[in-house]
């Protein structure tokens, strides 16, 4: 089967890392990129140099108005567009069947569907969506309906970390209820120094100077991808001054009591079996920087987990909120194309 051809709208953190993941995995072909604020020479520079993930290990250049990206194994010849209106991007002309909507702007079905006017067949929103169906690889991707799901969401990076872990625990032991905290790395929406921030005043405080309590819909979103957990999970975030890698703390009550060894065994089995490549298991004494560039959605930290009793436990899982998530965007497209 030929590789699915994709376009990327928005060449920011996720857009660029989706391209890196696509080149690395070699399961899709990127044929077009659109960003109204970045010209092709700047795209070359931004893709080549990355303060968090290091220099791109392949070769990138601008030739004949196209972005040429190769890593020695495969070459992507990418048409570049600079349109603000998604309906005006000629995805069909470029051969892009799947569009990754990674601007963070067009997250509703109505707005994201503008890509279909340009000839795209499917749109994958790389953010949570209020009205598009959300799919998390390893959790509910088997519910994808190719005939009817044209605009879908890959959920959030935090939901992609939490949901696989919650599924394993719920399937094996039953989750009665739970609270999640994500200790989350800085993202582009934060301020470098104190500045105005609408109603959520704390969000406007300097990212490099503070631990900032923040809201997140990631835990509630698990209820959308695992209906049995709807209304049973909620959570919050603490934004911290690190550039990448976040960690989920899931504290939950279990229906069926379990020792920590039994919980670890269940996660380890899933990581080696049905969730291989999505969920990972470690017993090493790791810290956040050890996971920069990790392609998994969720890395269970066996040594960091604790229990008060067999029915009340705190479970810890790491995730590269940039690169791990970008890998799942590519995987979701590959999966959908195979249906």
From Swiss-Prot:
Q: Under which EC number(s) is this enzyme classified?
A: 1.2.1.12
One biological process term from GO is: glucose metabolic process
Subunit structure as annotated in this protein's UniProt entry: Homotetramer.
- A molecular function GO annotation: glyceraldehyde-3-phosphate dehydrogenase (NAD+) (phosphorylating) activity
In the record, the note on similarity to other proteins reads: Belongs to the glyceraldehyde-3-phosphate dehydrogenase family.
Where in or outside the cell it occurs: the entry states:
Cytoplasm
Q: What is this protein called?
A: Glyceraldehyde-3-phosphate dehydrogenase
List the catalytic residues. Answer: 157
Cellular-component GO terms for this entry: cytosol
Tell me what organism the protein belongs to: Onchocerca volvulus
């Amino acid at each position: 089967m030929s590789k699915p051809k994709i376009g990327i709208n928005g060449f920011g953190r996720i857009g660029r890392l989706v391209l890196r993941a696509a080149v690395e995995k070699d399961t899709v072909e990127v044929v077009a990129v659109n960003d109204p604020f970045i010209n092709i020479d700047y795209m070359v520079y931004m893709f080549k140099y990355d303060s968090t993930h290091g220099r791109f290990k392949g070769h990138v250049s601008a030739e004949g108005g196209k972005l040429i990206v190769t890593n020695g194994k495969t070459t992507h010849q990418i048409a570049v567009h600079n349109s603000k209106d998604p309906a005006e991007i000629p995805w069909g002309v470029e051969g892009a069947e799947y569009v990754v909507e990674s601007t963070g702007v067009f997250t509703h079905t109505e707005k994201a569907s503008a890509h279909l006017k340009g000839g795209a067949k499917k749109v994958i929103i790389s953010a949570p969506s209020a009205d598009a169906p959300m799919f998390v690889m390893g959790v509910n991707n088997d519910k994808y309906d190719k005939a009817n799901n044209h605009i879908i969401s890959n959920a959030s990076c935090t939901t992609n970390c939490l949901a696989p872990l919650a599924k394993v625990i719920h399937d094996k032991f039953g989750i009665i209820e739970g609270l999640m905290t994500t200790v989350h790395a800085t993202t582009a929406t934060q301020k470098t120094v104190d500045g105005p921030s609408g109603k959520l005043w704390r969000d406007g405080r300097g990212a490099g100077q503070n631990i900032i309590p923040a809201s997140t819909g990631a835990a509630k979103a698990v209820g959308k991808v695992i209906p049995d957990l709807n209304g049973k999970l909620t959570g919050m975030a603490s934004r911290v001054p690190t550039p990448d890698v976040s960690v989920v703390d899931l504290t939950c009550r279990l229906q069926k009591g379990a020792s920590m060894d039994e919980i670890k065994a269940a996660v380890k089995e899933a990581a080696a079996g049905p969730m291989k490549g999505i969920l990972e298991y470690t017993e090493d004494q790791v810290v956040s920087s050890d996971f920069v560039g990790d392609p998994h959605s969720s890395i269970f930290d066996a040594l960091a987990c604790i229990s008060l009793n067999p029915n009340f436990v705190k479970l810890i899982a790491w995730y590269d909120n940039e690169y791990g998530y970008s890998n799942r965007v590519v995987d979701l497209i590959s999966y959908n194309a195979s249906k």
